[in-house]
């Protein structure tokens, strides 16, 4: 399995995103991330992700983009365990990673937290 993040693995359907945040989804926090996920059958990929960094916390787009890049990279490297579990269960998930902190965080810390979050999703 390749370590790439394809376009179909990015969540961009407005209808699914609205459904995720309107209710019916599950969520938990692994500071500095809040993870919201929802089983959705109409996705093309087994897991599609959305990454959000608040403009209120980081005024500069450069910093927001850095955080998004760190989360995306951590997910890309560690997604295999999640994808294997989803293939076993024949389930598809929409996952949103929301960055909560107002401080920049090292990539190693974010990767550790993303691993923890993915493990918790696999448990449930």
Segments (PLM) and residue ranges:
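Positively charged, solvent-exposed patches that mediate nucleic-acid binding
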Residues: 1-124
